Regions:
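A conserved ligand/cofactor-binding region detector
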Residues: 1-280
Length: 280
C-alpha cells in the first residue's frame, strides 16, 4: 500500500494496510446467500473494534502477529490505533452485535440494519474532578465502512430525505461474512454541535444521524428521536422489499423471502411502514 518495508512503516501505516487487506479478504470469502434472509433491525450495534476479531475469524491472527513481531512491530500496538465504531452503547447494542456474529458463524443468510451515527452517544472525560460529555467521532476516510451505492427517499411532513447506505462486513468464524447495513444522510453536519454535545435539535436536515439516543427531555428531542427511528425503518423496509423482489418475490409471498426481527421498540414502526409501502 505504501511501497515500503514493514520495518520502515509507522504503526498507523500498518493499521491502514491491514484494514485494506482484511476488507479484501472478507470480500473474497463471499457472503451468505439464500432465498430467505433474516433482517435484524436495531437502533444500536455495539460491535467493538473489528481488526482483531476479523483476523481471528479469518484464521490468520497468529500468523499476522508473528510476521509483525519478526519485523519489530506488535499487533497489540496496531490494534490501539483503531477507533471503535460509535454505533452502540449498552446491552441492547451488544446483544445485536452477538446475534450478527452468530448468524455469520452459523452460515445463515442475514444482515443487520441500523443507522450510521457520526458521533455516537458521547465520550466521557474528566477535568478538575468534573465529568464532561463530548462527541465521540469515529468515521475516517479509511474505515470499515463501504459505500453500497444504494439510496432511498424517505418522506417526512414538508420535506424528503435521501439516504445513503454503508456496509460493514461481519465475519463468521471460519465462514463467509454477512453485512451490517447502516443508513446515513449525506448532509449530516457535525459542525452544528456546540459546547459538549449540545446542538440544534430542530435542524432535522443536518442532525438526523449525528448522535445515538439524542436527548429527548423536550419536544424537539422527542421529535428528533421519532424522525430518526422512522428514517431507519423506512429505509429498512424499502431495502427488504427491493431484495425480495429481486429474488422473484411477488410481495404476496414475502414471508418466504424475509424474516424480520426488531430489537426492542425503536424499530417497531417498520410494521406500519411495511404495510404503507405494500399498499402503495
Amino acid at each position: 500500500k505504501y511501497n515500503k518495508n514493514v520495518k520502515d512503516c509507522t504503526n498507523e501505516e500498518i493499521y491502514h494496510g491491514l484494514l485494506s487487506w482484511t476488507k479484501e479478504q472478507l470480500k473474497g470469502r463471499g457472503y451468505q446467500e439464500g432465498k430467505k434472509k433474516i433482517y435484524y433491525i436495531s437502533a444500536e450495534f455495539l460491535i467493538g473494534k473489528l481488526l482483531s476479531n476479523n483476523l481471528i475469524n479469518l484464521g490468520v491472527y497468529d500468523e499476522v502477529a508473528k510476521y509483525l513481531k519478526e519485523n519489530g512491530k506488535e499487533l497489540s500496538m496496531i490494534e490501539e490505533i483503531e477507533p471503535e465504531p460509535s454505533l452502540g452503547n449498552g446491552g441492547l447494542g451488544r446483544l445485536a452485535a452477538c446475534f450478527l456474529d452468530s448468524i455469520a458463524t452459523l452460515g445463515l443468510p442475514g444482515e443487520g440494519i441500523g443507522l450510521n451515527y457520526h458521533l455516537g452517544l458521547f465520550k466521557q472525560e474528566f477535568k478538575d474532578h468534573l465529568q464532561f460529555e463530548t462527541p465521540n467521532p469515529w468515521i475516517q476516510p479509511e474505515s470499515w465502512l463501504t459505500d453500497a451505492g444504494v439510496s432511498y427517499y424517505v418522506p417526512f411532513k414538508g420535506f424528503m430525505l435521501k439516504s445513503t447506505l454503508y456496509d460493514i462486513d461481519v465475519a463468521g468464524y471460519e465462514n463467509k461474512a454477512i453485512k451490517l447495513r447502516l443508513f446515513d444522510i449525506d448532509i449530516a453536519d457535525e459542525s452544528i454541535v456546540g459546547e459538549g454535545i449540545s446542538f440544534d435539535k430542530k435542524d432535522l436536515l443536518h442532525n438526523l444521524t449525528l448522535f445515538l439516543y439524542p436527548d429527548d427531555s423536550d419536544d424537539a428531542g422527542r421529535k428528533l428521536r421519532i424522525y430518526q427511528q422512522y428514517f431507519m425503518v423506512s429505509n429498512a423496509a424499502q431495502l427488504i422489499l427491493d431484495e425480495a423482489t429481486a429474488k422473484g418475490c411477488n410481495l404476496h409471498d414475502l414471508a418466504d423471502y424475509a424474516v424480520i426481527q426488531i430489537n426492542d421498540t425503536h424499530p417497531s414502526m417498520v410494521i406500519p411502514e411495511l404495510i404503507r409501502l405494500l399498499t402503495e
